[in-house]
Every structure is written in C-alpha cells, then in structure tokens.
Amino acid sequence: MTGSDLIGIMILAAGLFAVGVFGVLARRGMLFQLVALEVALSGPALGFIAAGAYHADPEGQGMFILVLTLAAAEVAVGLALFLRLRRLTGTDDSDAISGLKG
C-alpha cells in the first residue's frame, strides 16, 4: 500500500464518519440514529485497518476488533432503549424521551 492509497482510504473513512454524524444529528427516529451511529463507527474502524496495513502492524486489526465490540454493545443497548421507548410512548421519536417522567 502506498501513501496515496492511505490518503484515499483515510478520506473515505473521514467521509463515512461525517455522514454518520450528520445522520445522527439530522434524523429524529431513534432507529435511524442507531444505524447512522453504526456508519459513523465504521469510519474510524476503516482508518485503523488502513493504518495498520500501511505500517504492516497488526495493532490496526486489534483496534478494529475493539471498535467492532463497542459497536455491538452500542447496538444491544440502543435496541433495548428503542424497544422501551416505543413501548412507553408509542413512537420512535428520540425527542419523546424528554417528555418521560420518573
């Protein structure tokens, strides 16, 4: 892998992260926000893999597994919150959380 390949992949990783953050901020549905957060987490994961491949270092793969584990935990907690919010309010609007009492 050359330096220009690494730059291209890092630009792609930054783009994935930016699209994910925009999706989290722009969408009101909690399920869409969870999907956008997964897209945002895939950007740094791609960056770790690319940097590890460029430097011939396996630590990039280790960081990828860490990001993958964190993403799985985030999905589990997020889906549990989504189901609870949907049961309590009847909607998946994340703004409905502010109306909950107690």
UniProtKB/Swiss-Prot annotation:
It is found in: Cell inner membrane. Coiled coil: none annotated. GO terms for cellular component: NADH dehydrogenase complex; plasma membrane. One of its GO terms (biological process) is ATP synthesis coupled electron transport. It comes from the Bacteria. It is an enzyme of class 7 (translocase). Pfam families: Oxidored_q2 (PF00420). The chain crosses the membrane at residues 6-26, 30-50, 63-83. One of its GO terms (molecular function) is quinone binding. It catalyses: a quinone + NADH + 5 H(+)(in) = a quinol + NAD(+) + 4 H(+)(out). Its EC number is 7.1.1.-. It is a multi-pass membrane protein. Keywords: Cell inner membrane, Cell membrane, Membrane, NAD, Quinone, Translocase, Transmembrane, Transmembrane helix, Transport, Ubiquinone. NDH-1 is composed of 14 different subunits. Subunits NuoA, H, J, K, L, M, N constitute the membrane sector of the complex. NDH-1 shuttles electrons from NADH, via FMN and iron-sulfur (Fe-S) centers, to quinones in the respiratory chain. The immediate electron acceptor for the enzyme in this species is believed to be ubiquinone. Couples the redox reaction to proton translocation (for every two electrons transferred, four hydrogen ions are translocated across the cytoplasmic membrane), and thus conserves the redox energy in a proton gradient. Belongs to the complex I subunit 4L family. This is NADH-quinone oxidoreductase subunit K. It comes from Rhodopseudomonas palustris (strain TIE-1). The lineage of its organism: Bacteria, Pseudomonadati, Pseudomonadota, Alphaproteobacteria, Hyphomicrobiales.
